[in-house]
Amino acid sequence: MENTHYKRLGGEKSVRELVDRFYDLMDSRSDTHELRAIHAVDLSDARDKLFMFLSGWLGGPSLYIEKFGHPRLRQRHMPFSIGELERDQWMTCISQAMQDMHIDKELIKELYAAFYKTADFMRNQ
């Protein structure tokens, strides 16, 4: 069986931890105000959807697709103004979340590149 990013990260528990740390950072940092502003007050739904999406995106169970169908990331994010600032704030939070989890440096490097490519694709401004 393939050694996916999902497995290398530590599976379901670690993906959930990454998502929770990401949103905790986004919710508490003073330098991510613009990113936080495009989210609902209650982040529960966002946490669940990102967890389900990342599970499949990282090579684990395709939870998001099973529940909602194809992610259509860009289309689903089109109602929100996403520019370089929001992309960079998103990357700051995911990068810090990975560092806080003490993930293997090589895996962080690989994930950072993949996250950046996706985050940059989401820009619509």
Locate predicted features.
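Core of compact, soluble alpha-helical bundle domains
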Residues: 1-125
